[in-house]
């Protein structure tokens, strides 16, 4: 009898140990601090996913594991299950993803919502292209519109850009400042504070929420509201890891993604408003463009769209079709 009891107890312990070791983890790398709105949004995703499944979500923020530029390779290779990267990080192999960074193309929240909605004509092209890298888009994280940061002089005219070295975070954004006579410097988000502090660049661009989360008002004193591009981040997951999950687990990820995507998109206007207030409260001058200044910047940078179309297949190519789809939104 004692032997039977021992066997039963051993079996229970083995089953318990197996369950522990079989625990499914989803590690997510993020370049921003957890307190930033993208980090807070990942907490929404974590809560919703863990509520619906046995997947345990672990978030590694502040580029602890990978910098933004390293995320596509890390996730695509399976070095980590998932990660958040700015959309432009996939432009090396898929230049069409830079559609959102074309100057002044998405000039209203309505257009941005339509373009980034799951299943939109634009995402029907972008998501499969990104997935070829082995990193599958789960959902887009709104980061807001791109603004310009500088010291002393606002960046409100083409002349203000001339001969300045400017921090950018993508090739197409680099083409934008080049078209205005500036010199682009590709610097990751986690390194921009030091670049401004050390004077490595004369000016820079970012999403206004980054001014708050990274305390950029400590090193730059002027914010020009150009809204020249729509900054999108994307949570991607490794394709092989996704395929290894059960149908129930994948369904839970899809449901959690939908909730988190809607949450960050709906709160974007409030996030930006709070960021502008904090920037102003900390001494930053907020400069808004006049209609004449906006027109001048738009006209001076129009060649960027033509160059994008040429780089993505020319007339009738994928980029041309995306630009036309964007103009119809």
Q: Where on the chain are the PLM-derived regions?
A:
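Ser/Thr/Gly-rich flexible loops in soluble cytosolic domains mediating phosphotransfer, phosphorylation
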Residues: 115-117
């Amino acid at each position: 009898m004692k032997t039977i009891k021992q066997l039963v107890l051993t079996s229970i312990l083995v089953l318990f140990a197996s369950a522990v070791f079989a625990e499914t983890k989803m590690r997510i790398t993020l370049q921003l601090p957890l307190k930033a709105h993208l980090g807070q949004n990942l907490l929404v995703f974590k809560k919703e996913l863990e509520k619906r499944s046995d997947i345990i979500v672990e978030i590694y923020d502040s580029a602890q594991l990978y910098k933004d530029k390293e995320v596509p390779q890390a996730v695509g290779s399976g070095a980590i299950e998932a990660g958040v990267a700015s959309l432009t990080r996939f432009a090396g192999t898929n230049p069409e993803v830079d559609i959102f960074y074309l100057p002044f193309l998405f000039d209203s929240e309505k257009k941005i919502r339509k373009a980034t909605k799951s299943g939109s004509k634009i995402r029907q092209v972008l998501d499969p292209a990104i997935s070829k890298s082995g990193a599958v888009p789960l959902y887009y994280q709104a980061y807001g519109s791109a603004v310009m940061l500088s010291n002393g002089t606002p960046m409100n005219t083409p002349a203000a850009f001339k001969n300045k070295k400017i921090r950018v975070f993508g090739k197409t954004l680099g083409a934008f400042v080049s078209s205005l006579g500036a010199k682009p410097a590709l610097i990751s988000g986690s390194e921009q504070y030091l670049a401004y502090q050390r004077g490595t660049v004369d000016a820079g661009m970012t999403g206004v929420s980054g001014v708050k989360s990274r305390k950029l008002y400590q090193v730059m004193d002027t914010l020009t509201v150009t809204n020249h591009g729509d900054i999108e981040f994307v949570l991607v997951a490794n394709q092989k890891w996704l395929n290894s999950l059960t149908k129930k687990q994948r369904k839970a990820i899809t449901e959690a993604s939908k909730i988190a995507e809607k949450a960050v998109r709906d709160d974007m206007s409030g996030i930006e408003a709070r960021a502008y207030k904090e920037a102003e409260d900390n001494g930053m001058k907020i400069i808004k463009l006049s209609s004449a200044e906006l027109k001048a910047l738009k006209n001076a940078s129009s060649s960027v769209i033509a160059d994008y179309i040429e780089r993505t297949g020319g007339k009738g190519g994928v980029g041309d079709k995306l630009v036309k789809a964007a103009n119809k939104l």
